[in-house]
């Protein structure tokens, strides 16, 4: 896996954003059970500090979620790695992400060589994410919309990744999943959630597996500018 040249150039940091600090994060993720070396290498390369407010840059490589405004967060690196590892098991080519947020998860997926489609309901967050994609030379297709409806024009997808929690899995998204594809999403209430993995098998049937307890912001309907 080779990152785009502009991403490699931007990835260089100093102090608490240095490569040494990122290496420590990757080792922590490995110790916490992340095994896919493609995912670990990508997390090592993609500059998380560029996806958060400059005031929080010193905390960019802590294994913790951080606020990005509008009541949203950039997910904990372990959660990003776990969800990415789960979808990579089906060797996807095209993936739909629901909830662009800062754009960090999108950048991880694109840097793994996937064709990424991402939807964000908050216009300001999407504009900021698009600016980061351009700065890093990452090609990602994005739109401002209600993510719960998916993106039917480009369906089916080999993988769908949802970055906000709904009370149940959304049928509209499941319908856009290709045969052999996988959907990974947090499911539950604000007080109790689990990361769920859904796979559409070769005969078209659906299997479910609960992966981990997690905490995500809620998946909300509608759009904001």
Swiss-Prot record:
Record EC number: 2.1.1.77
Catalytic site: 75
Main location: cytoplasm
Enzyme class of the recorded protein, top EC level: transferase
Classification via Pfam families: PCMT (PF01135)
Keyword S-adenosyl-L-methionine on entry: yes
Top-level taxonomic group: Bacteria
Database matches in PANTHER family: PROTEIN-L-ISOASPARTATE O-METHYLTRANSFERASE, PROTEIN-L-ISOASPARTATE(D-ASPARTATE) O-METHYLTRANSFERASE
Function: Catalyzes the methyl esterification of L-isoaspartyl residues in peptides and proteins that result from spontaneous decomposition of normal L-aspartyl and L-asparaginyl residues. It plays a role in the repair and/or degradation of damaged proteins.
Name listed for the protein in its UniProt record: Protein-L-isoaspartate O-methyltransferase
Primary gene name: pcm
């Amino acid at each position: 896996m080779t990152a785009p040249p502009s991403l490699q150039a931007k990835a260089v940091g100093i102090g608490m954003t240095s490569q040494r600090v990122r290496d420590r994060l990757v080792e922590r993720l490995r110790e916490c059970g992340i095994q896919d070396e493609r995912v670990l290498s990508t997390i090592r390369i993609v500059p998380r500090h560029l996806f958060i407010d400059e005031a929080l840059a010193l905390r960019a490589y802590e294994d913790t979620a951080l606020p990005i405004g509008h009541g949203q967060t950039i997910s904990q690196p372990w959660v990003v790695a776990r969800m990415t590892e789960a979808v990579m098991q089906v060797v996807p080519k095209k993936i739909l992400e629901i909830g662009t947020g800062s754009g960090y998860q999108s950048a991880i997926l694109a840097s793994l060589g996937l064709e990424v489609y991402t939807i964000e309901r908050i216009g300001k967050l999407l504009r900021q994410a698009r600016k980061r994609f351009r700065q890093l030379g990452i090609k990602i297709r994005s739109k401002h919309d209600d993510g719960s409806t998916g993106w039917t024009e480009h369906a089916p997808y080999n993988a769908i990744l949802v970055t906000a929690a709904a009370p149940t899995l959304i049928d509209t998204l499941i319908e856009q999943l290709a045969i052999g594809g996988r959907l990974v999403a947090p499911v539950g209430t604000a007080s109790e959630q689990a990361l769920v993995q859904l796979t559409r098998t070769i005969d078209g049937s659906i299997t479910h597996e609960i992966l981990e307890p997690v905490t995500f912001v809620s998946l909300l309907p509608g759009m904001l500018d």
